[in-house]
Amino acid sequence: MAALAKFRPVDSGQHDKDELREIVRERSFRFGRYTLSSGIESDIYFNMKPTMMVARGAQLAALEFLKIVEQVKAEYVGGLEMGAVPVIGSMAAVSSMMNKPINTIFVRKVPKAHGTRDVIEGLGPKEDLEGKVVLIVDDVATSGKSILKAIEEVRRVGGIVGDAACLVDRDEGATALLAQHGVTLHSVLHASEFVERH
């Protein structure tokens, strides 16, 4: 039970966000020459798995995203594999420990070739997204195409998506692209916050 005491309320304040930023800086931010999943060449890179796979990073990221869940009154949270999976897993666990559980799903890039062959994973046999408000999340937003793919799949099965969120926004077009599809992007952190202090 002692571990539970360390989980702060959703409105955890600027201190936790500052701590999260430093974890991202230490574990996930890199300078170099990289080709991003969008095909764009960049001299900065965010590999968010090391942040999301360490306990404190996962907790703090989940708390920031859960603020957005409350703001937009989402009933479900989901995103595209692989980047969103650690995020939504942490959100499910932390929200339950706070007695404010949020249901989560993830969208496969390609349907499984066996079993249920579902594109959307996480729903029970009698559960669907028809008419449900879904917040789409991702670890990093660049062009916004990965987030948009998840949005399209959720909307295809009747989910309502008006908002998306990312842990780090590279500010390279995601906000504008999603706005064209009626979606507001909420960003926890921005790439400029890391470049300016390097």
Curated annotation (Swiss-Prot):
Protein name in UniProt:
Orotate phosphoribosyltransferase 1
EC supergroup of this enzyme: transferase
* The protein's required cofactors: Mg(2+)
Which positions carry the signal peptide feature in this UniProt record?
none
From the UniProt record, list the reaction(s) this protein catalyses. Answer: orotidine 5'-phosphate + diphosphate = orotate + 5-phospho-alpha-D-ribose 1-diphosphate
| Enzyme Commission number(s) of this protein | 2.4.2.10
Keyword DNA damage tagged: no
InterPro entries, sorted: OPRT (IPR023031), Or_phspho_trans_dom (IPR004467), PRibTrfase_dom (IPR000836), PRTase-like (IPR029057)
Quaternary structure and partners: Homodimer.
Q: Which gene encodes it?
A: pyrE1
Q: Which UniProt keywords apply?
A: Glycosyltransferase, Magnesium, Pyrimidine biosynthesis, Transferase
Question: Where 5-phospho-alpha-D-ribose 1-diphosphate is bound, by residue?
Answer: 108-109, 112, 114, 138-146
**MF GO annotations:** magnesium ion binding; orotate phosphoribosyltransferase activity
Known role: Catalyzes the transfer of a ribosyl phosphate group from 5-phosphoribose 1-diphosphate to orotate, leading to the formation of orotidine monophosphate (OMP).
Q: Name one GO biological process term.
A: 'de novo' UMP biosynthetic process
Q: In which pathway does it act?
A: Pyrimidine metabolism; UMP biosynthesis via de novo pathway; UMP from orotate: step 1/2
Taken from the UniProt record, the cysteine pairs bridged by disulfide bonds within this chain are none
Q: Which residues bind orotate?
A: 142, 170
Name the HAMAP family on file: PyrE (MF_01208)
SUPFAM superfamilies linked to this entry: PRTase-like (SSF53271)
